[in-house]
Amino acid sequence: LSQRSKLTVVGAQMVLVNTVKERVNLMKNRKTYAELQSELMKRYPQGVTSGGVSVDDIIQLKIQNTYDTHLDIARDMAGVMRADMAAYDENPENFTQSLGCWSGFHAQQMIRSVKRLRGTTKGAYVYLSGWMVAGLRNRWGHLPDQSMHEKTAVADLINEIYTSLRQADEVELNDLFKALSAAREAGDIAAEKAAIQAIDNFESHVVPIIADIDAGFGNEHATYLLAKELIKAGACCLQIENQVSDAKQCGHQDGKVTVPREDFIEKLRACRLAFEELGVDDGVIVARTDSLGAGLTQKVPVSMEPGDLASEYIKWLEVEPITDTSPAREGEMLLSLNGEIVRPVRLPNGLFAFKENTGRARVVEDCIASLTQGGADLLWIETATPDVEEIAGMVNEIRKVVPNAKLTYNNSPSFNWTLNLRKQVRQGWINEGKISETDYPDGNALMSAEFDDTELGREADARLARFQHDISTKAGVFHNLITLPTFHLTAKGMDELSNGYFGEDRMLAYVGTIQREEIRRGISAVKHQHEVGSDLGDTFKEMVGGDRALKAGGAKNTMNQFDAA
């Protein structure tokens, strides 16, 4: 390397070390090796308990237990999110990301991968999708995203995710303590100091979870009770939507029904009270609005004075005039709007309709009310397509009232990303006069693989690659997430493996598509016994039994074949 390149590498390493230290410092319950050693030696001056347990072993177990309770996790991760939000306010390129995970193992492997890639977990979260809980993690099979699954499933998954992330801490710290023991046995003081420094600077795999609480699973009190369970499981961030709880739909399906803003604000307050009661003072609330695609409301709120929340909600209702030819009927609801008596359009199921093309205006008002009266910290605007300009336009209006408004954005698998981006490029180029309408087909034909290596296909892919950067720097998106990637990844991965394994490739299908790639990419799970804690068991057996320990990691363990990996 040139001297300039060496300086660049050293500088990058210093930034990484400082970043990791910042993350470690945010974990308030962590003590250093020396601090624990000092405390324990005061209790056990001989370096061993009366029962023969080594102080060194106690130190190891205390450090490996990175969190005593999941409520401690919620408190610390809320601080992490707040710090990240402040960093975004200073520079919108400091956006954060997450992937939706439907098991603890998915979350663990995601964060392990992030640490291998970046050397830190900074900016990486876990998203817990209500859709995937409904579709994959409930007792009644695969259900649609309509709040039909049991409430406890969400808290159970949060608990599972953090158990898996904490076990990843244990496994890696156990390896560091092995290095410390080896250094001491060899009398290598420099290696011993390096091992202790690595232990003290270890960055936990524990990261913030954004937990989907749907529409609250009931009234405001039910929302509060469920929120407490999610927080106690470790959630520092709750995402709640303004749909009717018992009529809830996936945000990318039709038939969505919203609640009046007063009702939604009460649920936001319920979440805040849950955080405050449990001592998670920095807890983060994401207020999601589905109004852009929702054309119905379940009830009409009561307006007490002009300009209040109810009147601002009612003004968007589809109404019909009362006339001689269309008089009021017995038992019919009537409204006084703009000095006229009108009837709100009501469906046979009792729901009320909004005027066409009012979704955007309702979204802006929803967001302002959630931030200014509901105490929400972040917004979520559910959209039908991935369009930076559309989101930016709404955010700019919101920021006229709340200048630091920030969003979480769903980079949803419900979007046909290839088709949408290619359509956007095509239309943009036509508007600019760069191409004519006949140069590329319109509609679904743009999905054809024949356009992959065309100028349009390459430009669409380039926009895909920078989409999250663009939406964060231009449209106020603090957090980018993909809701269902592990659902689709599992489906695609099993299809790929099954086609080869049950086809002609058989074992080559497994080795070629999985094991060889694991080895060459340094994926730790290739040593699957080690990944699930086999070495932890051996270490503990040594702690209590010494030379009598019957260990699994001996010479005959076939995992040794992967030592070169």
Model feature map: region roles:
Residues 429-556:
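Conserved alpha/beta catalytic core and glycan-binding cleft of carbohydrate-active enzymes
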Residues 6, 100, 104, 216, ...:
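Glycine-centered flexibility motif
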Residues 411-416, 486:
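Short beta-alpha junction loops
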Residues 37-39, 43-58, 65, 70-92, ...:
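Alpha/beta enzyme core
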Residues 143, 186, 255, 296, ...:
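Short alpha-helical interface elements
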Residues 243, 412, 535:
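Histidine-centered beta-alpha loop that forms part of the nucleotide-sugar donor binding/catalytic region
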Residues 1-26:
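N-terminal amphipathic/basic-hydrophobic helices that include classical n-h-c signal peptides
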Residues 23-57, 521-565:
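C-terminal extensions of enzymes
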